[in-house]
UniProtKB/Swiss-Prot annotation:
Subunit structure of this chain's protein: PSII is composed of 1 copy each of membrane proteins PsbA, PsbB, PsbC, PsbD, PsbE, PsbF, PsbH, PsbI, PsbJ, PsbK, PsbL, PsbM, PsbT, PsbX, PsbY, Psb30/Ycf12, peripheral proteins PsbO, CyanoQ (PsbQ), PsbU, PsbV and a large number of cofactors. It forms dimeric complexes.
Encoding gene, per UniProt annotation: psbI
A Pfam family matched in the record: PsbI
UniProt entry keywords in alphabetical sequence: Membrane, Photosynthesis, Photosystem II, Reaction center, Thylakoid, Transmembrane, Transmembrane helix
Chief place where the protein resides: membrane
The protein's name: Photosystem II reaction center protein I
Amino acid sequence: MLALKLSVYSVVFFFIAVFVFGFLASDPSRTPARKDLED
């Protein structure tokens, strides 16, 4: 039962991380400060 719970938590955390990363990476126009730092 513990392994099942850990696997579910890991999958949920993975999807949340992918969603947050994709949201930040696909939205460079709303973060001009990061664009200035890259220069």
